[in-house]
A protein has these predicted regions:
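Conserved, mostly hydrophobic/aromatic
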Residues: 6, 20, 77, 110, ...
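Acidic-and-aromatic substrate-binding clefts and catalytic sites of carbohydrate-active enzymes
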Residues: 6-14, 36-39, 66-70, 95-102, ...
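Catalytic pocket-lining loop regions of alpha/beta-barrel enzymes
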Residues: 117-118, 125-224
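Active-site neighborhood of phospho(di)ester-bond hydrolases with catalytic His/Asp-centered motifs
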Residues: 2-5, 29-32, 91-92, 120, ...
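An N-terminally biased module of ancient metal coordination in phosphate/nucleic-acid-related enzymes
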Residues: 1-72
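Mid-to-C-terminal alpha-helical segments outside catalytic/metal-binding sites
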Residues: 1-5, 15-27, 31, 142, ...
Length: 267
């Protein structure tokens, strides 16, 4: 079973299924999204869509609007999961800045009740927002089967990554997926994941195939195939793993076995 462990919802959803079929991928784990760059046909349209993403990544957020946006995005995600249950699993967002009880209530209402498999993607725009993740970690103590997926490329700094590492060690029952292998800080993250049982590597959006090669060499049982579609292509990311690794068992684990085990999918 080949599973793309990190894709954002593409519209129309049939386009997403077509890409999976072309790549020879059986299932994908969908994450919510606000921008839809796949809709853009011109550079200006693309810039308009990406401006929304940059605001999210920079931490330019309004708490009330943020929660409403998340609710709408979750509804879009659930609609896709219900329409194609044989093709998709889902992760759902959780707002930062809530207290512990509010966070647990949100997880119950939007994550657990919808049978989502984890929480995220979290895109902290500054170190203070990384620190706010501790409330999420505390809440997940009640749901140890739900991993947390955190964006660790720009604008997350090395200091922010160090804060996330400390949280990962402080809450060993919470599985943490380090999204995009930490960007330019990939060596720090690979070393950390190698020594930390509850830490995992998302292989999407790496800036070099060498990064993926080193991750596979050091922590093959912690590597998760993903494309970050529509920002990456399921086929190309799958081919890169197959090219860089010659061990069939390791390839099969990275392409689906590792994430199946992490999420207890029982496929």
């Amino acid at each position: 079973m080949i599973i793309d462990s990190h894709e954002h919802l593409i519209l129309p959803i049939e386009m997403q299924i077509k890409k999976l079929k072309e790549a020879g991928v059986d299932k994908a784990i969908l994450f919510t999204t606000t921008p839809h760059p796949e809709k853009a046909n011109t550079m200006q349209e693309f810039k308009n869509e990406m401006s929304v993403l940059f605001k999210v990544l920079s931490g330019e957020k309004n708490h009330k609007n943020d929660m409403k946006r998340m609710e709408n995005n979750i509804n879009d995600l659930i609609e896709a999961l219900k329409k194609y249950p044989d093709k998709f699993y889902g992760f759902g967002p959780v707002p930062l800045g809530l207290n512990l009880d509010e966070t647990i209530s949100w997880i119950e209402k939007y994550i657990v009740s919808n049978n989502l498999k984890g929480v995220g993607e979290f895109t902290p725009g500054n170190d203070e927002q990384v620190k706010q993740l501790e409330t999420i970690f505390q809440a997940l103590g009640n749901y140890s089967y739900l991993p947390i997926w955190v964006h660790t490329f720009y604008p997350v700094t090395l200091n922010g990554i160090n804060i996330l590492m400390e949280l990962t060690k402080k809450y060993p029952k919470v599985s943490v997926i380090f999204g995009h292998i930490g960007g330019y800080n990939w060596m720090n993250i690979i070393d950390f994941v190698k020594e930390t049982p509850n830490a995992y590597l998302d292989l999407s959006a790496s800036f070099s195939s060498l990064v993926v090669k080193m991750a596979i060499a050091e922590v093959p049982n912690k590597c998760l195939y993903s494309s970050d579609a529509p920002y990456g292509e399921p086929l190309l990311n799958k081919q890169m793993i197959e090219y860089l690794c010659k061990d069939k068992e390791v390839i099969n684990n990275i392409l689906g076995g590792n994430i199946s085990k992490l999420l207890n999918l029982n496929l």
